[in-house]
Curated annotation (Swiss-Prot):
Protein name: Bifunctional purine biosynthesis protein PurH
Gene this protein is translated from: purH
Species of provenance: Anaeromyxobacter dehalogenans (strain 2CP-1 / ATCC BAA-258)
A GO CC term assigned to this protein in UniProt: cytosol
Cysteine pairs bridged by disulfides in the record: none
HAMAP family assigned to the protein according to its UniProt record, in alphabetical order: PurH
Domain of life: Bacteria
One Gene Ontology term from the biological process aspect of the record: 'de novo' IMP biosynthetic process
Residue ranges annotated for the MGS-like domain, each copy included: 1-144
Length: 524
């Protein structure tokens, strides 16, 4: 039978109605601070923990519930003779229900509060009570989520106790709650540079907090279950995870991956730009005078692959752009915004998923990345791979001309465009670019020469006079020879092959230009 409950919550959602239901069952309520005040003002009978323990709060409220009469009442094992003797000798009544959620540490961090303020929001007594109750779940219920108030109150009203199954369910949630809380603290401290020394680039222990946003219909394939988890804090750069879904069917696992690929690609550009993604790799990229023109030009690179694709635009969508978008079957569109006319035009495509990421419309120079957002995580069975995200870029001055002929001004422009795109294509990656758009893309092949051949074979536009980006060096001259055969006139690549001399000789023989970046962009 539940006779006594300790209630101390920061999130007071649903608190008073829940407490009233407990009080109506004759449950004695113990409480502290703001929770006690809220209950008393609502007319709910409540006993202050200080009165209960005969030990007033000290240290400005830092010590309130850390007392044997509290933790003894929570932790003692009912029916165990030695425990029963201990609590009887010390006059420690049982506490059968603990209702606690923790100080808003994450909210303080998200609000950009000073370090000292965030430290004061690290809860001590709360997690201790939660862990005590969860450890003794054979006898004690612990509620950390207001969403469980109805379930707990209804069961107590029906049976005056909580079943073993319910207590185990609450135990799991309690330990997940405290684990996430501690991980958030660790993550915050890891990302913060200590005053006396810079932190290690990668911490010895990696803690991160992700909360399930929703279940997915399935994972990458229908036989795989899937779910989407969201980080505790919204990034300061554009984010698929925190974008607003304005219309369409629920997002799938593959949609989310492809949207991220599209977003990462379009974030390379300050100019009005569009990226079309299919199976996590670009099939068309272009800039334009308007968003609609950028989309139309990107689609022309590979109109077959663009069907059913994912589109990212870095400018708001107007009615003219919406008209272009509705001319092709698309899965998703992400943009900084949509005007009313565009929303009306796109609404006819009821299954089209529209996402809005307002920060995508801001200047790239205004985006800031917290240290943890500059990392990329991938799991393998039994382990986690962590690396810096590939945010590398090059300018013209960073490149070294490898050939006798230097690129023309137009070729330089096309080369740097191709280099922005090729880092987002699956390796081995080849991009033909001309006049601020891709004209052919080849990727995902196990040899570089085959990626060149694939790009040329698939090209819907004329590749003659284009410039080519390669995500890694050419191991042999054959890839360059195929590029020359296709009619391209300039190449940008990392350089560094053992056979660079042969590759350069092939380029010089044909009179094309080649530059080295010294930076590789493998994507697996």
């Amino acid at each position: 039978m539940t006779r006594r409950a300790l209630v101390s919550v920061s999130d007071k959602t649903g608190l008073v109605p829940f407490a009233r239901r407990l009080a109506a069952l004759g449950v004695e309520l113990l409480s502290t601070g703001g929770t006690q005040k809220a209950l008393a003002e609502a007319g709910v009978p409540v006993v202050g923990v200080g009165d209960y323990t005969q030990a007033p709060e000290i240290l400005g409220g830092r010590v309130k519930t850390l007392h044997p009469r509290v933790h003894g009442g929570i932790l003692y094992r009912r029916g165990l003779a030695s425990d029963e003797a201990d609590v009887k000798a010390r006059d420690i009544p049982p506490i059968d229900l603990v209702v606690v959620n923790l100080y808003p540490f994450r909210e303080a961090v998200a609000a950009g509060k000073p370090f000292e303020t965030c430290v004061e929001e690290i809860d001590i007594g709360g997690p201790t009570m939660v862990r005590s109750a969860a450890k003794n779940s054979a006898h004690v219920g612990v509620v950390v989520d207001p969403a469980d108030y109805e379930k707990v109150a209804a069961e107590l009203e029906a049976t005056r106790t909580l079943s073993a199954a319910t207590r185990f369910y609450l135990m799991k949630k309690a330990f997940a709650h405290t684990a996430a809380y501690d991980a958030a603290i660790s993550e915050y401290l890891t990302a913060r540079e200590a005053p006396e020394a810079a932190p290690a680039h990668f911490p010895a222990t990696l803690a991160a907090v992700y909360t399930k946003a929703y279940d997915l219909r399935y994972g990458e394939n229908p036989h795989q279950a899937g779910a989407f988890y969201r980080a505790a804090r919204e990034p300061e750069e554009p984010s698929v995870a925190f974008a607003d879904v304005l219309q369409g069917k629920e997002l799938s696992y593959n949609n989310l991956l492809d949207l991220q690929a599209a977003l990462a690609g379009v974030m390379e550009f300050d100019e009005t730009a569009c990226v079309i993604i299919k199976h996590n790799t670009p099939c068309g990229v272009s800039t334009g005078r308007t968003a609609g023109e950028a989309f139309a030009r990107a689609r022309e690179c590979d109109p077959v692959s663009a069907f059913g694709g994912i589109v990212a635009l870095n400018r708001p969508v107007d009615e003219a752009t919406a008209s272009e978008l509705t001319s092709l079957f698309l899965e998703c569109v992400i943009a900084p915004g949509y005007d009313a006319a565009a929303r009306a035009a796109l609404a006819v495509k009821k299954n089209l998923r529209l996402l809005e990421a307002p920060r995508l419309g801001a200047a790239r120079a205004t985006w800031r990345r917290r240290p943890e957002e500059g990392r990329e995580l991938r799991s393998i069975p039994g382990g986690l791979l962590v690396m810096d995200r590939d945010l590398g870029s090059v300018r013209r001055d960073d490149c070294k001309v490898m050939t006798k002929r230097a690129p023309t001004e137009q070729e330089w422009k096309d080369l740097l465009f191709a280099w922005k795109v090729v880092k987002h294509v699956k390796s081995n990656a080849i991009v033909f670019a001309k006049d601020d758009r891709t004209v052919a893309i080849g990727g995902g092949q196990t040899s570089r020469v085959e990626s060149v051949k694939t790009a040329v074979m698939k090209a819907a536009l004329d590749v003659r006079g284009s410039s080519v980006g390669s995500d890694a060096f050419f191991p042999f001259a054959d890839g360059v020879e195929e590029i020359i055969k296709a009619g391209a006139t300039a190449i940008i690549q990392p350089g560094g092959s053992m056979r660079d001399a042969e590759v350069i000789a092939a380029a010089d023989k044909a009179g094309i230009a080649m530059v080295a970046t010294g930076m590789r962009h493998f994507r697996h």
